[in-house]
């Protein structure tokens, strides 16, 4: 049997995780996508199939403030804080964390930690 590439392993983990994770309007899903250069996070209501709020390293609000590249832990922390601020402004306090098949380490962990510190509960 052939070995899977890192991308295929991530996709396989994500499919397995999504079987158990589901966001509602009371407790939406915080989905994280990580690329080599950027990180993206969305708060999603799966019942209504809509994105409530989002943040990424490509946002104009963050681009000017970030001294490091979009693929750093510092940038991930800034994205987590911005996303938590936007979610709290819309009245969302609790979310279900969907790491998107990525390992809970590095940039994904930094985003989650800063979102928790900014007031989101998960």
Curated annotation (Swiss-Prot):
Part of the 50S ribosomal subunit; part of the 5S rRNA/L5/L18/L25 subcomplex. Contacts the 5S and 23S rRNAs. GO terms for cellular component: cytosolic large ribosomal subunit. It comes from the Bacteria. The keyword RNA-binding applies. Gene3D superfamilies: 3.30.420.100. One of its GO terms (molecular function) is structural constituent of ribosome. SUPFAM superfamilies: Translational machinery components (SSF53137). The lineage of its organism: Bacteria, Bacillati, Cyanobacteriota, Cyanophyceae, Synechococcales. The gene is rplR. Coiled coil: none annotated. Belongs to the universal ribosomal protein uL18 family. Residues 1-27 are annotated as: Disordered. GO terms for biological process: translation. This is Large ribosomal subunit protein uL18. The keyword DNA damage does not apply. Keywords: Ribonucleoprotein, Ribosomal protein, RNA-binding, rRNA-binding. This is one of the proteins that bind and probably mediate the attachment of the 5S RNA into the large ribosomal subunit, where it forms part of the central protuberance. Residues 9-27 have a biased composition (Basic residues).
């Amino acid at each position: 049997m052939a070995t899977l590439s890192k991308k295929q392993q991530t996709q396989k983990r994500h499919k397995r995780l999504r079987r158990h994770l589901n966001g509602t309007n009371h407790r939406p899903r915080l989905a994280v996508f990580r690329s080599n250069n950027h990180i993206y996070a969305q708060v999603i209501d799966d019942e209504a199939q809509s994105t409530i709020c989002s943040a990424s390293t490509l946002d104009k609000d963050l681009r000017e403030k970030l001294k490091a590249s979009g693929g750093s832990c510092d940038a991930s922390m800034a994205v987590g804080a911005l996303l938590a601020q936007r979610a709290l402004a819309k009245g969302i306090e609790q979310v279900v964390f969907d790491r998107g098949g990525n390992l809970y380490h590095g940039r994904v962990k930094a985003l989650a930690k800063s979102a928790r510190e900014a007031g989101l509960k998960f």
